[in-house]
From Swiss-Prot:
Lineage, broadest ranks: Viruses, Adnaviria, Zilligvirae, Taleaviricota, Tokiviricetes
UniProt source species: Acidianus filamentous virus 2 (isolate Italy/Pozzuoli)
UniProt-recorded name of the protein: Uncharacterized protein ORF345
Domain of life: Viruses
Length: 345
């Protein structure tokens, strides 16, 4: 029989060597059979240690260590509470891979992020969570009402019962339903500032800063899907059809100073000094990446201006200034006093 990697070390230390890293389903199913001993898996020759450690104590608490990342599990009847370490510790690709191997489909792991998957009306939403300490409560149940009122159904069956997510932290289904069905910030801003954005778009079109582009009509199937999903972040690339469908910037007349993308924009505030130029705050909506999951990845706040040569310039400013007036932006950036006008800095 072929020896497993790390068999000598496991025998020497008195560990129980597993053939493979166990999944959550296996751990839950065999909970009462685990001894008060270290279970190990996947020996790393470079580190001269195991990647995976697991121990269930006589108190009923189980601890799992994957590299330096710790998970604590407590079971009471059909309920289990899992406490995960700080999400900022999730940096190594191999750590993400092993965590996925253990906990998917309950959770998925990315750099600095733990993600849960919620299905509502056959539509899948991916909710990123980045806490210092992540707690999730699971339950095995046959009760249809409990399954219906759970945050998510993992589809895992153990002894005829379904494993569901009851709570994440102290938040239940109601909180997450509000979160995934709310209108995103960028959509609210597009509606609120549509008139001022349209006026500036017409002005830039006349000045040659904007050009008319090809009007691309969204397929009806995609439109219905988008509306049905209530503008899910993973379909944000289709927002371009609702914002600026016939405009594109003339790059010869634009100085972006390192900003990569402003084609889909919202103009929220403006200031004209009456002499030199008009300055306005532009919120860019990046629709290029089809897998963005958070609004921070979508919105970019910029300060732009049109000079006396009818050229557009833009500089990037912090997203903290998303709702600030231009006067407040200048006052903060250049430490102006109340008597100094915007263009006197």
């Amino acid at each position: 029989m072929k020896k497993m990697k790390g068999e000598k070390k496991a025998k020497r230390e008195g560990y129980i060597l597993l053939q493979e890293i166990p999944k959550l389903e296996y751990i839950f199913k065999n909970w009462n059979e685990f001894e008060d001993n270290f279970y190990v898996a996947e020996y790393n020759y470079n580190l001269k240690d195991f990647k995976f450690y697991m121990r269930k104590y006589i108190t009923g608490i189980m601890r799992i260590w994957i590299y330096n990342y710790e998970i604590v599990m407590k079971r009471k009847g059909d309920e289990i509470e899992i406490t995960l370490d700080d999400a900022k510790k999730i940096q190594c690709w191999d750590l993400m891979k092993i965590l996925d191997q253990v906990f998917y489909p309950v959770m998925r792991f990315y750099q600095n992020t733990i993600e849960i998957e919620i299905v509502n009306n056959d539509v899948t939403y991916y909710i990123p969570i980045r806490p210092k300490e992540f707690k999730i409560s699971l339950k095995l149940t046959e009760n249809e009402n409990e399954i219906k009122n759970a945050i998510a159904n993992t589809k895992i069956k153990i002894d005829g019962k379904t494993l569901v997510i009851k709570k994440v932290g102290n938040k239940g289904k109601k909180y997450f339903m509000r979160r995934i069905l709310r209108i995103p910030i960028y959509a609210k801003m597009m509606l609120k500032y549509r008139k001022i954005t349209h006026v500036f778009a017409k002005m830039m079109l006349k000045k040659g800063i904007l050009e008319q582009g090809e009007f691309r009509i969204m397929p009806l199937l995609k439109l219905e899907k988008l509306l049905y999903k209530k503008m899910n972040f993973r379909d944000i690339k289709y927002m371009k059809y609702f914002t600026m469908p016939i405009y594109r910037f003339n790059r010869d007349r634009v100085n972006l100073q390192g900003i990569s993308y402003i084609d889909n924009f919202i103009i929220t505030d403006y200031y004209y000094d009456g002499v030199n130029q008009i300055v306005f705050k532009l919120i860019a909506v990046d629709t290029r990446d089809p897998i963005v999951t958070t609004e921070k990845e979508v919105l970019a706040t910029t300060l732009c201006g049109i000079d006396y040569k009818n050229n557009l310039w833009c500089v990037s400013i912090s997203n903290l200034m998303l709702y600030w007036k231009i006067s407040a932006v200048y006052k903060f950036m250049y430490d102006l006093d109340d008597r100094t006008k915007v263009f006197e800095y």
